[in-house]
Amino acid sequence: MPRGLELLIAQTILQGFDAQYGRFLEVTSGAQQRFEQADWHAVQQAMKNRIHLYDHHVGLVVEQLRCITNGQSTDAAFLLRVKEHYTRLLPDYPRFEIAESFFNSVYCRLFDHRSLTPERLFIFSSQPERRFRTIPRPLAKDFHPDHGWESLLMRVISDLPLRLRWQNKSRDIHYIVRHLTETLGTDNLAESHLQVANELFYRNKAAWLVGKLITPSGTLPFLLPIHQTDDGELFIDTCLTTTAEASIVFGFARSYFMVYAPLPAALVEWLREILPGKTTAELYMAIGCQKHAKTESYREYLVYLQGCNEQFIEAPGIRGMVMLVFTLPGFDRVFKVIKDRFAPQKEMSAAHVRACYQLVKEHDRVGRMADTQEFENFVLEKRHISPALMELLLQEAAEKITDLGEQIVIRHLYIERRMVPLNIWLEQVEGQQLRDAIEEYGNAIRQLAAANIFPGDMLFKNFGVTRHGRVVFYDYDEICYMTEVNFRDIPLPRYPEDELASEPWYSVSPGDVFPEEFRHWLCADPRIGPLFEEMHADLFRADYWRALQNRIREGHVEDVYAYRRRQRFSVRFV
C-alpha cells in the first residue's frame, strides 16, 4: 500500500461518520413537525429510519474503502497507522466519542468481526474521560421565580417552540405549582429555581420538557410530558420530580427519544445529574445513539470483569427452549445465545429468532420490551466460565463456539438488561406486592397489544421485573404483529365426549390463538387466579383482542404513558 493512503482512509471514515450524524440530526429535527401535525405513523417510520442510518452509512464507507484499496488486503502495521491518523483527527472533533464507535463498526464490517483488539479498535476511548469541547451555546436556560412560580412557568411554556394552541395554559400551570408545593413545601419552593433544556425530547405522541429543579437541598428532575387533545390543542399531562420517575421515563424498555443533540456527550453529561442511576451506555441509548451505547455497554462490562472474581453461570430461571442465557452473579446484564437446536415444539429457525429481535429493536417498545445489544465473535476467557456453564455451552451451542485454547469465541450473542424472572418474583411475594405484579403483567400485555405486538408465549417465565417493579417482556422468539394473529373463540363441543378427548374437536390453523386457553396456565396458582380474574379477565376473551386489532387496522395509535394513570393531572386534580 502506498504511504499516505492511511490518512486518506482515516479521513474517509470520519467524513462518513459526519454524513451519518448529519442525517441523524436531519431526521431528528423533523420531530417537532411530526408532533404538531399529529402524524403518528410518520413518527414510527422516522424512528425506524433513524435506527437504520448507522449501518447504512457504515456500509457506504466500507464500499469506499474497498475502492480506495482496490480490494487488496491490508497488514497489521498499515491498520495501526490508519488508527493513529484517525486518533489525531479527534481532539478538535465535537463528536469524538461516537466517531470512535463508527471507526470500530467500519473495521468490524471490513474484517468480519475478527481480530478485535485494543490496538486495532477503540475498545476504550483515546480521549480523556468526560472531555468536552467548547459549547457554542448553553444546553439549558435558567429560570428564577422573581415574580412567583406562576410567572416563571408562564415564561418557560411561552419559550417553547411549539406552534399549536394551548387548551388551558393557566390550568396546567396551576396544576404544576400545586404539585411542586405538595412535593417541596411553600418555603423550599420559594428558594428553588428551574434549569430547562433548550431542546424538547420527542417520543411516541408526546413532547417532553426536560429540566432540573434546583432546590436548597439538591437537584431534582423536572419533567413535563406535553400531549395533544383530539382537537390539536396542547396540554401538560403531569409533572414528574423524582429520580425514580425520571429513570422510568428514560428506561431501557422504551423507544429512543428524538432530541436534537449536535453535541451528544455534553447532553449526556447534563442529564447525568437527574438520572444518577443510569450508566453512560443507558444515557446514550435514551437519546438514540444506540451504536455508541453498545460501545459504552461493552466498556462497562470490561470494567466490571476486571474488578471482580466471579465466573459466568447459567442465569436463574427456567431454562429456555431457544436461548441459552448466562450472567455474572453481580452484573446487571445477561448474555443470550441462540441454541444450535430448539425444543421440538419450537418450529422456527435461528434466522427467525434474529428477525424477531430486530423487530423489537425497531418497534415502539412502549416501556414493556427490553432493548438488546447484538455482538458477533464475542471472546470469553475460559477462566471466567464456570465448569457447569462451559459444559452447557458445548452441549447447547457448540456450533457457535470456537475454542482458542485459553479463550472461546461465541459467534453471535445478545446482551440485555438483567431482571428478576416474573415466575420467580411471584413465588417470593405476597399481599400488595403480588397484586401489583399481576396488575403490571396484565398492563404489559395490554400495552404491547395496543402497540401491535403479540408476545406469543405469555408464560410468566418470559417476563422480568425491573428494579422499579415494572414488568417487562424479554423472550422474543414467538413475537409477531397483532394483525397477523387470528383470535378465535373455542367452538362449543358437539358431544359431551368432545371435552374428554385428547385432541380438540375443532380445526386449528397456523396463526390461530384461543384466548380462553390463557386461563389454564395464567390462573393455575390459587394465589394468582382470583387476582387475574378480577383485574384482567377480558384478556381471556377473543372479542377483546379482535377489538384491538380493529383499532390498529383503522390506523389508531394508542397513547403511551411512562407513569401511572393516577399521576395524570386529569385523574389527580379533577
Curated annotation (Swiss-Prot):
Q: From its record, what is one biological process in GO terms? A: tricarboxylic acid cycle
Active site location:
371
Keyword tags: ATP-binding, Cytoplasm, Glyoxylate bypass, Hydrolase, Kinase, Nucleotide-binding, Protein phosphatase, Serine/threonine-protein kinase, Transferase, Tricarboxylic acid cycle
Question: Which reactions does this protein catalyse?
Answer: L-seryl-[isocitrate dehydrogenase] + ATP = O-phospho-L-seryl-[isocitrate dehydrogenase] + ADP + H(+)
EC number, UniProt record = 2.7.11.5, 3.1.3.-
| Domain of life of the native organism | Bacteria
Entry's localization field: Cytoplasm
Q: Which GO terms describe its cellular component?
A: cytoplasm
What is this protein identified as?
Isocitrate dehydrogenase kinase/phosphatase
Tell me what organism the protein belongs to.
Answer: Escherichia coli O1:K1 / APEC
